[in-house]
């Protein structure tokens, strides 16, 4: 059941021209302390690359401004597609990785 709606202006919460500045597949939620959070796969070169890390951005002002990205999970595999569920004062973060075999399949694309 949707209890609360948050309105924001359309726009970017992060913009980087850096080589590893690609952030994608976001999920947004409200933390028990009231802050907004967006989790995603970030610090990537592009959609398909082996360097993704699960990252989070935080906002204390209803989405007007956002923190720099914080790394929540990083492994030697590509950390992808973070999901978020906040319920009953608890936070569940989901993510997955791809195997080295799958990464080898796409070698040379990055």
Each language-model region and where it sits:
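Asp-box/BNR beta-propeller blade signature and adjacent active/binding-site loops
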Residues: 1-110
């Amino acid at each position: 059941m949707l209890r609360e709606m948050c309105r924001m202006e359309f726009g970017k919460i992060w913009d980087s021209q850096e080589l590893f500045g690609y952030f994608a597949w976001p999920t947004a939620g409200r933390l028990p302390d009231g802050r907004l959070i967006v989790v995603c796969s970030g610090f990537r070169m592009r959609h398909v690359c082996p360097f993704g890390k699960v990252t989070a951005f935080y906002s204390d002002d209803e989405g007007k401004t956002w923190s720099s990205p914080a790394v929540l999970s990083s492994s030697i595999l590509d950390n992808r597609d973070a999901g978020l569920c906040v319920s009953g004062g608890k936070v569940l973060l989901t993510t997955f990785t791809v195997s080295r075999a799958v990464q080898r399949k796409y070698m040379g694309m990055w």
